[in-house]
Amino acid sequence: MPPLPPPAANPGWRLAPPGRRRYKDWMPEGIVVVRDGRIESRELRRLVDLFFEDMVKYVVDVERGAVAVGGEMHADGEEALLEEGSRQPDLWGANYYPGRGREECIEYTSLINIRPAQGNRSMEIQDPAVRERVRELTFARIGEGEALP
């Protein structure tokens, strides 16, 4: 695999500085891990505004119940949860759209969801049980599609 080009050649990329691999060292303000309770609405607003303006990417650990909210890519949240002890097979990515209501606020799509070994051959979460668990944890840790202040 060829090496990645330098950041100047890819201004949209945020590469970790040399010798700093942990997400906390290079994107501490861009990801919030919620282990219990719900993320504060002002913090969620900050993350929505920081990256995409109308949505936020997040990753759910369906076994431990933790959720990593934020980041430019789902892989950022995945890395955050892996560093905290999650197992990769338990991590699923989705997008949250505040203000769309309960039925429209979750998009179950992410590149990290492509895993043929687990029977998921698509970016979208295909297993109904996994989708339901992601939905439960989204409502418990992030929100139910209500508008943000």
What are these regions (language model features)?
Residues 38-80:
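Negatively charged, low-complexity tracts enriched in Asp/Glu with abundant Ser/Thr
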Residues 72-103:
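Amphipathic, interaction-prone secondary-structure segments
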Residues 8-9, 16:
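Ala/Thr-enriched low-complexity intrinsically disordered regions
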Residues 98, 102-125:
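Intrinsically disordered, low-complexity regulatory segments enriched in Ser/Thr/Pro
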Residues 123-149:
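Well-ordered alpha/beta subsegment
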Residues 40-48, 116-127:
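Short histidine-centered catalytic/ligand-binding loop motif
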